[in-house]
Amino acid sequence: MKYTHVLWDFNGTLLDDVEPCIKSINELLTRHGLEKLTGLSQYQSVFGFPIIDYYRRIGFDFDKTSYDELAVEWVKLYNEYNRPLKLCPGADKALSYLKERGVRQFILTASSVDMVRSQLSELGIGGYFDEIIGVDNIHAFGKSGIAAEWIKREKPESAVLIGDSDHDSEVASAVGIDCLLVSCGHMNAEKLAHLRAVFRDPFDAVKSISE
């Protein structure tokens, strides 16, 4: 294998939560008198980081309702819609493939470690990971800071980040590791193609690094 360590983004890369995200944002838009997104294609084309800019793009006026209020409202909707949890296509196969080849696997997330651990348990994939690298166990802000602290501590021989967004590409660049992107998540292939190699799903991505 080309890498000894794989860092996985979670939402949109392993956890298939695109549909609940679309449902949640559309209900939020409707509640605030705004036009709903038409579906997956439009969602993937407008979604991005930071989230506050994404909210502006789709019409929210923070003079009317603050971003913090909207974010709290969205999380409540998301938690309702994101049931039952499901894996992205090819995710389980990818995790198993890497484990069989002795590659150490980690989750890199800006979410709560406890929440992600619970979700991994529910999905039945917790045993694949050496560690969840998140905001609860490393005192740094944002995924770049979290990843940098982990690299300093772990000193991986060779590492790659697999994610589904331009932000994942930026994080990998910031900490000096490679990155592969998948188009099954929150951004489409067209939006990602100028950044990195883009693969259909996690299994396609890991197959590319086994050659």
What is each PLM-predicted segment?
Residues 161-200:
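Acidic, Mg2+-coordinating phosphoryl-transfer loop and its flanking beta/alpha structural elements
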Residues 92-99, 151, 169-173:
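Surface-exposed amphipathic alpha-helices with a cationic face
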Residues 1, 101-103, 153-157:
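Glycine-rich phosphate-binding loop signature in dinucleotide/nucleotide-binding domains
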Residues 5, 143-169:
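Conserved Lys-Pro-Asp/Glu-containing loop-to-beta segment of HAD-superfamily phosphomonoesterases
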Residues 43, 125-141:
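A short, structured active-site edge motif that brings together acidic residues
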Residues 25, 91-120, 135:
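Substrate-recognition element of Asp-dependent hydrolases with the DxDx(T/V) motif
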Residues 3-92, 101:
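N-terminal helical cap/lid subdomain that shapes the substrate entry/recognition surface
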Residues 46, 86-90, 111, 138, ...:
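Short beta->alpha linker loops
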